[in-house]
């Protein structure tokens, strides 16, 4: 599902919500989550999952084209861990 599909689905599910308002709401939620992660905060949505930053230490990598060694600096990467309820909901065994 893309962001525009999410907005369309919200507007269809809630007739009192104009598509423009759904777009604004989704944008504000995603901005708030991005800002929280940029500050180093953890985001927990009960029943859905949590977002946090994982630290990746500096390392020596290789340029795949030339085989030359390159220094890859340390960085933080966003990480999502699904909550128990979400894992159970998507674990459909037929």
Curated annotation (Swiss-Prot):
GO biological process terms on file: DNA recombination; regulation of DNA-templated transcription; regulation of translation
Q: What CDD domains would the database entry show?
A: IHF_B
SMART domains per the UniProt record, alphabetical: BHL
This protein's GO cellular component annotations are: chromosome; cytosol
MF-aspect GO terms: DNA binding; structural constituent of chromatin
Q: InterPro entries attached here?
A: Hist_DNA-bd, IHF-like_DNA-bd_dom_sf, IHF_beta
Q: Is Transcription regulation among this UniProt entry's keywords?
A: yes
Q: Which residues form the signal peptide?
A: none
| Taxonomic superkingdom | Bacteria
> Pfam families from the entry?
Bac_DNA_binding
What UniProt keywords apply to this chain's record, in alphabetical order? DNA recombination, DNA-binding, Transcription, Transcription regulation, Translation regulation
Quaternary context: Heterodimer of an alpha and a beta chain.
Family under the similarity heading: Belongs to the bacterial histone-like protein family.
Query: What is known about what this protein does?
Result: This protein is one of the two subunits of integration host factor, a specific DNA-binding protein that functions in genetic recombination as well as in transcriptional and translational control.
- NCBIfam families, from UniProt? hip, PRK00199.1
Identification of the protein by name:
Integration host factor subunit beta
User: What organism does the UniProt record list as the source?
Assistant: Azoarcus sp. (strain BH72)
Q: What is the lineage of its organism?
A: Bacteria, Pseudomonadati, Pseudomonadota, Betaproteobacteria, Rhodocyclales
């Amino acid at each position: 599902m893309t962001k525009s599909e999410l907005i369309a689905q919200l507007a269809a599910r809630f007739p009192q919500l104009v598509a423009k308002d759904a777009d604004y709401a989704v944008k504000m939620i995603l901005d708030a989550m991005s800002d929280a992660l940029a500050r180093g905060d953890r985001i927990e949505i009960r029943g859905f999952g949590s977002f946090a930053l994982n630290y990746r230490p500096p390392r020596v990598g290789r340029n795949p084209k030339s085989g030359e060694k390159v220094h890859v600096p340390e960085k933080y990467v966003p990480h999502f861990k699904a909550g128990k309820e979400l894992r159970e909901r998507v674990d459909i065994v037929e």
